[in-house]
Amino acid sequence: MIIDRIEEQERYYPLHPDMELAFAFLAEAPDLEPGRYELENGLFATVSEGDTRQMDTVSLEAHKKYIDLQYCIAGGERMSWAHIQELNATTDDPEHDNYFYTGTSTSVSIRPGMFYVMFPSDGHKAACHHEFQKHYRKVCLLYTSPSP
């Protein structure tokens, strides 16, 4: 898992061949309408806005085929993370590359200008809150994880 500010993006370009392409899309995202966007090399992104969900009502999820990069454009959210080896698997949806878990996780506040990257070993909850609901605008970008 990576959490950082968008200004630090260049340090992550060497991690994946499509990382620079992903960040280039994020530069355009604040002006885009909500919806799904198809990019080069099989990357796709969803620009969305809404209200955060109560943290304890959301399951942890992970993806086996994709790396998940999420960027907060406006508002804010809390996200939660745990390594999947420390979690209990509950439901698999391989058709949509979603795998759900329960267990203890660590949460952090995500503010505008911050991004986080979740790898296949990272269980996560996104767009959540503990006490007070917030409105957010964000981008979720998925790109293929290199084969192990």
Per-region residue spans from a language model:
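Surface/interface-facing alpha-helical segments and adjacent flexible terminal/loop regions used
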Residues: 1-34, 38-39
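Conserved short histidine dyad/triad with adjacent acidic residue
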Residues: 46-61, 78, 82-86
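Glycine- and acidic-residue-biased ligand/ion/polar-headgroup-sensing regions
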Residues: 67, 71-77, 94-97
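His/acidic/aromatic-lined binding-pocket segments of jelly-roll/cupin-type domains
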Residues: 67-71, 107-108, 115
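Short beta-strand His + acidic residue motifs that chelate non-heme Fe in jelly-roll/DSBH
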Residues: 79-80, 108, 124-131
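Non-DNA-binding regulatory cores of transcription-related proteins
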Residues: 91-103
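Conserved metal-binding segment of the jelly-roll/cupin
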Residues: 110-123
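Conserved small/polar residues in nucleotide/adenosyl-binding loops
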Residues: 143-148
